[in-house]
């Protein structure tokens, strides 16, 4: 079986792999059903990115050239997106004489799961294919800690990126939105009110919820007719 390659029409948003790694239902609500809701955290995250999303800004310090907002694409993964910062470091001791590092900016602090690492690794894999090079690690910069955190792009992480990207394409092609599963991660999710995780997979809860909505609508209509 040959390697799968995706056409331009089939490319999915690279940033979506972070949503997918966190919650497959959240990703589907955003990218399959096109629903979105902002909360304080998403707004803060956008503001943090605005400070680095200047495609015309290039900074050179000593032996490091930093380029912002570089477009990325991988037809093997079927993903496209933007790298916050790519650093090109002069290193005469390396085979290529240039070391490449990707830096992704995030609000808050390091997560307990690997969603940020997955997104960063996906960016690196895109850039590797574009430049036909090898990138061994990158950095996550968190707005709360004001520190860079090293991420090694080992085969385990690369394999997870490939698995998640394949699953994303399968869900997107089939229009799949997984059922809600309530957990601690739901508390700060920007889509909580749209997702309704409290209903979960219990059909009785779902039926009761829909029935209550219908009853409210009937009462509202009856009230309007009586005015």
Give the positions of each predicted feature.
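Metal-dependent nuclease catalytic cores that hydrolyze phosphodiester bonds in DNA/RNA
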Residues: 1-102, 202, 214-215, 222-227
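Aromatic side chains
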Residues: 20-22, 105, 141-142, 209
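Alpha-helical structural motif
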Residues: 13, 21, 25, 119, ...
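Mg2+/Mn2+-dependent nuclease catalytic core
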Residues: 62-166
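Structural motif
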Residues: 10-18, 114-115, 177-184
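Non-catalytic, well-ordered alpha-helical scaffold segments
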Residues: 14-15, 26, 83, 117-121, ...
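Metal-dependent nuclease catalytic regions and adjoining charged, substrate-binding loops involved
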Residues: 75-76, 128-227
């Amino acid at each position: 079986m040959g390697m799968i390659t995706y056409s331009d029409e089939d490319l999915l948003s690279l940033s979506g792999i972070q949503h997918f790694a966190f919650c497959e239902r959240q990703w589907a609500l955003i990218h399959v059903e096109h629903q979105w809701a902002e909360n304080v955290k998403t707004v803060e995250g956008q503001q943090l990115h605005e400070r680095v999303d200047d495609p015309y800004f290039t900074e050179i310090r000593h032996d490091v050239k930093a380029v912002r907002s570089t477009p990325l694409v991988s037809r093997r993964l079927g993903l496209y997106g933007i790298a916050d910062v790519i650093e090109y470091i002069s290193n005469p001791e390396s085979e290529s004489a240039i070391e490449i590092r990707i830096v992704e900016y995030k609000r808050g602090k390091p997560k307990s799961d690997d969603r940020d690492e997955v997104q960063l690794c996906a960016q690196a894999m895109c850039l590797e294919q574009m430049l036909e090079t090898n990138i061994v690690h990158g950095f996550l910069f968190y707005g709360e800690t004001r520190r860079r955190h090293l991420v090694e792009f080992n085969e385990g992480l690369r394999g997870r990126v490939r698995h998640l990207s394949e699953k994303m394409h399968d869900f997107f092609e089939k229009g799949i939105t997984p059922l809600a599963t309530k957990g601690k991660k739901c508390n700060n999710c920007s889509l909580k009110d749209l997702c309704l995780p409290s209903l979960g997979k219990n059909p009785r809860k779902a039926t009761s919820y829909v029935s209550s909505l219908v009853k409210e609508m009937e009462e509202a209509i009856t009230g309007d007719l009586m005015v």
